[in-house]
Amino acid sequence: DKKYIWFSSSNQFRGTSVGGPVHFIGNPADKTVYVTEGALKADIAHAFCKKTFVALAGVSHYRALEPIFAQLKRNGVENIVEAYDMDKYTNPHVEKSCMQMMEMANAYGFSVHRLCWDKKYKGIDDWLASRKKRN
């Protein structure tokens, strides 16, 4: 079930691939930044909670965060909160990528935290939306 369509010209002469774009929404100087997967998910989560989010195109693209983490460190960010989908507890591929991202954040000197919510909500956007409906 794909939410995004990626356009590429890699099959064309001098074309280019999509790469692994990183999406950012919020204040780049917040003390805490949340890392999730999917730009739309980050935008929805930000709309609900007004926190700062960085979103990967997919969990395996965590290396694309290196320049982002470097800049966030220069901006004074102190905390990185892992907010990957809840399948991080059931999918070994997601769990491995999650741990690699957290190790990278730790190597940059961030205090790293893991966010957990009710597993019946896959993503942070779903969980925040459910909380909004209850209030």
Locate predicted features.
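Structural alpha-beta junctions
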Residues: 51-52, 99-114
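Acidic beta-strand-to-loop metal/phosphate-binding motif
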Residues: 35, 78-92, 116
